[in-house]
Amino acid sequence: MNLFDQFSTFTKNLSNLGQGKLIALAVAGVVAIGFVLGAGIYVNRPSFETLYVGLERSDVTQISIALAEANVDFEVGTDGGSIQVPVGMTGKARLLLAERGLPSSANAGYELFDNVGSLGLTSFMQEVTRVRALEGEIARTIQQISGIAAARVHIVMPERGSFRKAEQTPTASVMIRASATVGRSAASSIRHLVASSVPGLDVDDVTVLDSTGQLLASGDDPSNSALNQSLGVVQNVQSDLEKKIDNALAPFLGMDNFRTSVTARLNTDAQQIQETVFDPESRVERSTRVIKEEQKSSQQQPDNAATVQQNVPQAAPRGGAGQQSSDEAEKKEEQTNYEINSKTIATVKNSYSIERLSIAVVVNRGRLAAMAGEPADQAKIDAYLQEMQKIVSSAAGIDPGRGDVVTLNAMDFVETQLLDQAVPGPGIMEMLTRNLGGIINALAFVAVAFLVVWFGMRPLARQLGFGGQAGKLEGEAAGLELPDFSPAGAGAGGALMEGFGSDFGFDGGDDLLNLGDEAGFNRRVKEGPERRLARMVEISEERAAKILRKWAVDRAA
């Protein structure tokens, strides 16, 4: 039966149903289709989990826009302050929102003064409003730093009093929501920012911590000591040298074929040097002083002897000539003062100086053998090692004068066996565990669809004449029903008996179906159905088989 015949049969069956049955059939079809669609939508509806709760209206709006732009399904809670996303999308959604600094509830800043009336406002309220506004403005500025999602600032201003002995200083604390790396790197900048924004606030009086309660920076933090700062300088120098060596060797060796270790000994002592330099060539005569002294003296000694007569008063006798002596002295002192140019140099060194470097580089022997080619000659490998040692020395700035050491060896790497193997993917059980919810939903949907088709659509199709084999058998077996051989139907069924006999190869005058022979007819009617069926099979096996197939289809329906 072709498609046109099936369509004709379908329209004929519909016309035979009547208006009431057609309406019932249409309602049943609509209900079945709606049930299947509703079940499919409900079963495949993704389950949601909470992303954020207790959000403000502005945050909900911004988060909804961001999720919609990223094609992430979401639902807003009935309270208007919570957002839900599909299960498994929480981490992705939070990372996406963190990149945009959401949620970021607005901190009140200087706009607080716009809503405060001056009438009846006490000095205490003015001070509190000023501190709140300052905290909000500083928090807004901190949130502008890349990687910081939210921030809160608390400032304690000193109370003013006339009878206080010691002067109080302001203090501040800052809480940020950011990753550990960003928080630690930005802690020092945040401290200086807050200290510069509050009058009289010292950097050591600012404490910074993250949302997990971990202290990032404080005044008594041991990490701010001179020792830890020196260790940080050493680590930075070592990592910088390792990076330079990696950049020099990676292009032809590959990052997985060598390992570098640098040990640096630094001198981080602070030095203060002050020196004065004089220029003797630039002297200028400033003053001259000259002192002259002359001394003269003479002495004469008489030649008379000392007697008693010399003591008697009498005219003084003339003495004889004695010894004479004279002295002369002359002194001259000259002093000249000069002005000389001088230069005073004061040097303060807070940096570091490298005292010694020790560098160790281990290279994968397999990579060197591949570079040397076949056969792998040891001389070629040694030549490569010498060239790489020169490269390492130049990249690290090795100075043999200060005792720097570079050691470069070729070894067999164990990691190369692992690097050649692909990373195994998740197992079957792991995949089933991850997708268990989706599998259950799919199986439930298939089961519901099967039940609807089996108990609803299949009987309906059978009633309308669908099912190609059943319709074909019904068409072929039309007119093959067993005739009524009873006497009551003899008068009206003469033509039927005649047709039935002709179907099985008999004419109207055949004595087997002759209605005139009532005795023989009654005898055949009294025979059981098995006997009559056997006679029909004997007459025409093919047509009897068609009738049996039709009976089997009707019984199954």
From Swiss-Prot:
GO terms for molecular function: cytoskeletal motor activity. Residues 279-337 are annotated as: Disordered. It is a multi-pass membrane protein. GO terms for cellular component: bacterial-type flagellum basal body, MS ring; plasma membrane. Keywords: Bacterial flagellum, Cell inner membrane, Cell membrane, Membrane, Transmembrane, Transmembrane helix. Its main location: membrane. GO terms for biological process: bacterial-type flagellum-dependent cell motility. The chain crosses the membrane at residues 23-43, 436-456. Residues 280-296 have a biased composition (Basic and acidic residues). The keyword Membrane applies. Residues 297-313 have a biased composition (Polar residues). Gene3D superfamilies: 3.30.300.30. It is found in: Cell inner membrane; Bacterial flagellum basal body. PANTHER family: FLAGELLAR M-RING PROTEIN. The M ring may be actively involved in energy transduction. Belongs to the FliF family. The basal body constitutes a major portion of the flagellar organelle and consists of five rings (E,L,P,S, and M) mounted on a central rod. The M ring is integral to the inner membrane of the cell and may be connected to the flagellar rod via the S ring. The S (supramembrane ring) lies just distal to the M ring. The L and P rings lie in the outer membrane and the periplasmic space, respectively. This is Flagellar M-ring protein. It comes from Rhizobium meliloti (strain 1021) (Ensifer meliloti).
